[in-house]
Amino acid sequence: FREYSEYDLKVRLPNKKIRVIKKIKIPLLGLHNIKNSTAATALALTVGLSISNIKKGLRNFKGVQRRFNKIFTFNNVDFFDDYAHHPTEIKEVLNGVKKVYSNYEKICIFQPHRISRLKDLKAEFASAFKDADKVILFPIYTAGEKIKLGFSYSDFAKEIIKKSKVKLFLVNDKYQLAKYIKYNIYGKKIVIGMGAGSISSWMREMPKFF
């Protein structure tokens, strides 16, 4: 497998000229990263950078923190961290992972961020995990919100199972997560932690529990 995206780009510049760049490579996965790099490429062409320098710069770009960053390996399984906390972001990350790791079981560890966001986008979240095989669901990171959710969290979990057609496990804290990983994560799998709350720091703590 490869942990990069490759694509061709056709750009119409402000002077109406058409430029075509073949086989652009970026060491990042996901449609959202391709969209960002195409915008950067168009700008670079507009200000006069050469195609070779543009391709070199994109090829060597390391990305930003918490955008599909590999954080550790356990039982020969790679664990990644991503800031995705909106249904659209989740879909794009999982779609990119599916294309590259097509023969792997894809496990998403998700921590919803803010009660209000989950209330407003409940249906969108429930169907956002279709490109995963399994979801491990954390309690909501409230970010200080004190409003009521308005529905059962277990019912929300069932809705994810129904709409995204995945297996799902509820965990209450990082200790339950560590136990689950230790005894269940091995073989041909890939694991992505997603969320804008404490999930990132918890994921990075996992190796000390094994």
Place the predicted regions along the sequence by residue.
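Short glycine-rich anion-binding loops that position phosphate/pyrophosphate groups of nucleotides
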Residues: 85, 112-115, 140-143, 196-199
